[in-house]
């Protein structure tokens, strides 16, 4: 018996519709057992129905990262949720045949004081108040000073997060199977401060410095922590990875062109 659990966006009609259809389909298959939220830790697969935000929220619930994620897109963009709503049955048929296409996504472990978080996309520091002019921060790489950043903030992203906030701030696109740090300044005051890519084997420490007094640290767009001057945000790669089930014919570069219109003439 293959045990799985389902997380879906309860605020979206399309996601609710797919959830009901999927539940009916799975119950018709004797090989699958659908678990409730209380028993999610026993699941071999977790099905996420919604958009990228639903997957990121679901990621926080997943304690055992050995579980495999089946991400079904119920919306429009769905860069992380690559399985189309009309193609999910083939995924489950392939599971029964033992044919699974899995891609590992590496994520951060983030330590802020005594609190610990996981970040699949990014960690970023911004102003705590829109009225404040700038936020000043320093970054250290394995205890070596990298530089001081002045502006609206700074983003530290994974390759998975390279197509999210970091991209909007002018960062590069990086293929998601890599283990790297992308550091992207947000509206820097110094024109020489540009995005930089670092090895994933290092530890990054981000600190707030004067004249800033307070800042906000955001983890995957959902967790907000107010930090004071000289507080440390420690970021390193987890030894675990997230396993995402992909369609057989999935081609990353096709996804890049289809979802982000990369390289296309938009005029």
Curated annotation (Swiss-Prot):
<dbReference type="GO" id="GO:0046872">
    <property type="term" value="F:metal ion binding"/>
</dbReference>
<protein>
    <recommendedName>
        <fullName>NAD kinase</fullName>
        <ecNumber>2.7.1.23</ecNumber>
    </recommendedName>
</protein>
<keyword id="KW-0067">ATP-binding</keyword>
<feature type="active site" description="Proton acceptor">
    <location>
        <position position="52"/>
    </location>
</feature>
<comment type="similarity">
    <text>Belongs to the NAD kinase family.</text>
</comment>
<dbReference type="GO" id="GO:0005524">
    <property type="term" value="F:ATP binding"/>
</dbReference>
<dbReference type="InterPro" id="IPR002504">
    <property type="entry name" value="NADK"/>
</dbReference>
<dbReference type="InterPro" id="IPR017438">
    <property type="entry name" value="ATP-NAD_kinase_N"/>
</dbReference>
<comment type="function">
    <text>Involved in the regulation of the intracellular balance of NAD and NADP, and is a key enzyme in the biosynthesis of NADP. Catalyzes specifically the phosphorylation on 2'-hydroxyl of the adenosine moiety of NAD to yield NADP.</text>
</comment>
<keyword id="KW-0520">NAD</keyword>
<feature type="binding site">
    <location>
        <begin position="163"/>
        <end position="168"/>
    </location>
    <ligand>
        <name>NAD(+)</name>
    </ligand>
</feature>
<keyword id="KW-0808">Transferase</keyword>
<dbReference type="GO" id="GO:0019674">
    <property type="term" value="P:NAD metabolic process"/>
</dbReference>
<feature type="binding site">
    <location>
        <position position="152"/>
    </location>
    <ligand>
        <name>NAD(+)</name>
    </ligand>
</feature>
<feature type="binding site">
    <location>
        <position position="187"/>
    </location>
    <ligand>
        <name>NAD(+)</name>
    </ligand>
</feature>
<feature type="binding site">
    <location>
        <position position="57"/>
    </location>
    <ligand>
        <name>NAD(+)</name>
    </ligand>
</feature>
<keyword id="KW-0963">Cytoplasm</keyword>
<dbReference type="Pfam" id="PF01513">
    <property type="entry name" value="NAD_kinase"/>
</dbReference>
<keyword id="KW-0547">Nucleotide-binding</keyword>
<dbReference type="GO" id="GO:0005737">
    <property type="term" value="C:cytoplasm"/>
</dbReference>
<dbReference type="GO" id="GO:0003951">
    <property type="term" value="F:NAD+ kinase activity"/>
</dbReference>
<dbReference type="GO" id="GO:0051287">
    <property type="term" value="F:NAD binding"/>
</dbReference>
<feature type="binding site">
    <location>
        <position position="150"/>
    </location>
    <ligand>
        <name>NAD(+)</name>
    </ligand>
</feature>
<feature type="binding site">
    <location>
        <position position="132"/>
    </location>
    <ligand>
        <name>NAD(+)</name>
    </ligand>
</feature>
<feature type="binding site">
    <location>
        <begin position="52"/>
        <end position="53"/>
    </location>
    <ligand>
        <name>NAD(+)</name>
    </ligand>
</feature>
<dbReference type="InterPro" id="IPR016064">
    <property type="entry name" value="NAD/diacylglycerol_kinase_sf"/>
</dbReference>
<keyword id="KW-0418">Kinase</keyword>
<feature type="binding site">
    <location>
        <begin position="121"/>
        <end position="122"/>
    </location>
    <ligand>
        <name>NAD(+)</name>
    </ligand>
</feature>
<dbReference type="InterPro" id="IPR017437">
    <property type="entry name" value="ATP-NAD_kinase_PpnK-typ_C"/>
</dbReference>
<dbReference type="Pfam" id="PF20143">
    <property type="entry name" value="NAD_kinase_C"/>
</dbReference>
<keyword id="KW-0521">NADP</keyword>
<dbReference type="GO" id="GO:0006741">
    <property type="term" value="P:NADP biosynthetic process"/>
</dbReference>
């Amino acid at each position: 018996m293959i045990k799985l659990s389902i997380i879906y966006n309860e605020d979206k009609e399309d996601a609710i519709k797919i959830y009901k259809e999927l539940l009916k389909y799975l119950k018709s298959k004797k090989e699958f057992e659908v678990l409730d939220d209380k028993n999610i830790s026993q699941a071999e697969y977790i099905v996420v129905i919604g958009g990228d935000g639903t997957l990121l929220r679901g990621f926080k619930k997943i304690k055992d990262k050995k579980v495999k994620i089946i991400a079904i897109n119920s919306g429009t963009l769905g860069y992380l949720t690559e399985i189309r709503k009309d193609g999910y049955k083939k995924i489950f048929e392939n599971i029964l045949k033992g044919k699974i296409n899995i891609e590992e996504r590496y994520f951060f472990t983030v330590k802020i004081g005594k609190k610990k978080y996981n970040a699949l996309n990014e960690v970023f520091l911004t102003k705590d108040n829109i009225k404040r002019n700038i936020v000043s921060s320093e970054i250290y790489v394995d205890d070596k000073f990298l530089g001081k950043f002045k502006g609206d903030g700074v983003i530290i992203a994974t390759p998975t997060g390279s197509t999210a906030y970091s991209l909007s701030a002018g960062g590069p696109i990086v293929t998601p199977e890599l283990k790297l740090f992308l550091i992207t300044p947000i509206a820097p005051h110094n024109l020489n401060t540009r995005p930089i890519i670092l090895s994933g084997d290092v530890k990054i420490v981000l600190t707030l410095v004067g004249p800033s007094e307070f800042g906000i640290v955001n983890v995957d767009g959902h967790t907000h922590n107010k930090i004071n001057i000289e507080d440390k945000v420690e970021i390193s790669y987890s030894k675990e990875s997230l396993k995402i089930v992909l369609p057989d014919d999935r081609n990353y570069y096709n996804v890049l062109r289809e979802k982000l219109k990369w390289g296309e003439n938009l005029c």
